[in-house]
Design a protein with these regions (language model features):
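Active-site loop immediately N-terminal to the catalytic Tyr-X3-Lys motif
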Residues: 99-100, 147-153, 175-176, 217, ...
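Substrate-binding pocket helix/loop in short-chain dehydrogenase/reductase
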Residues: 98-99, 106-111, 210
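Alpha-helical segment proximal to the catalytic Tyr-Lys
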Residues: 127, 171-175, 238
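Short C-terminal tail/terminal secondary-structure segment
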Residues: 147, 229-230, 241-254
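Short, small/polar-rich loop/turn modules that mediate ligand/substrate recognition or access, typified
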Residues: 88, 174, 179, 240-242
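Active-site helix of classical SDR
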Residues: 122, 158, 166
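Residue(s) in the substrate-gating loop at a strand-loop-helix junction
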Residues: 142
């Protein structure tokens, strides 16, 4: 028996990076995984990787910034699989730049995807979790939700909001069987970080000097974060709710 055997998991941002790794890791431990992403081809590719292992997955195109699409994702998941046990709110955008030059469009998109989208989908899934008297929500924040960096003012603000959203949901539903926790990754080797790296002089320069801000001396790998997602989603974390866990190679210890 897997650690999340026969549970139904929705993973957003499942086309690549941490979302892809989390979808695969949950499936490896027995979950039926809905791979949701705006990029349908990417979501389908992740689902096919899971199915190739003889496991259960499906792909779903969703723009989480659209509340109606979030409602549809939850409803269709319930119709197809009969429950919603795990929600991994991983989808996000990082559009770095100098703050006073940041357009309204970038501010709105960042907040709509990183904050409102997470709220929309959680709101859509929680009623079923309440009926089941069980559920685990894992929100992907960032180390930049705790400490900021140059060019990340708007992104950091959005990820800080994720931290407080996580704590609020945890408190609202702690006695009703639903747990909610957040993960704050450090610099992980995923496409979402590449634009920021360009502003810092390029990916090679960042990785050559990574020990200066990430003491472990290397970028994280998506699967390393996925292991933590699995733990928080499983019964092994049954006493953990409202927690904000850094997985940052020592960055926050500096």
């Amino acid at each position: 028996m897997g650690r999340v055997q026969d549970r139904v998991a929705i993973v957003t941002g499942a086309a690549s990076g941490i979302g892809e790794a989390s979808a695969i890791r949950l499936a490896e431990e027995g979950a039926k995984v809905v791979c949701a992403d705006l990029n349908l081809a990417g979501a389908e590719a992740t689902a096919k990787k899971i199915e190739a292992m003889g496991l259960v997955a499906s792909a779903y195109q969703t723009d989480i910034a659209d509340s109606d699409q979030c409602d549809a994702l939850a409803a269709d998941t319930l119709k197809r699989y009969g429950s919603i046990d795990i929600l991994v709110n991983n989808a996000g955008v990082n559009l770095p730049g100098t703050f006073h030059e940041t357009s309204n469009e970038i501010i709105q998109k960042t907040l709509q995807v990183n904050v409102a989208g997470m709220m929309y989908l959680s709101r859509a899934c929680i009623p079923q979790m309440l009926k089941q008297k069980s559920g685990s929500i894992v929100n992907m924040s960032s180390i930049n939700g705790l400490v900021s960096e140059p060019f990340l003012t708007v992104y950091s603000a959005s990820k800080g909001a994720v931290v407080m959203f996580t704590r609020g949901v945890a408190l609202d539903y702690a006695k009703l069987g639903i747990r909610c926790n957040a993960i704050c990754p450090g610099w992980v080797d995923t496409p979402i970080n590449y634009a920021h790296a360009d502003l810092l002089g390029g990916l090679k320069k960042v990785y050559d000097g990574i020990s200066s801000f990430q003491p472990i001396g290397r970028p994280g790998e998506p699967r390393e974060i996925a292991h933590l997602v699995l733990f928080l989603a499983s019964d092994e974390a049954s006493f953990i709710t409202g927690s904000v866990i850094s997985a940052d190679g020592g960055m926050s210890a500096m």
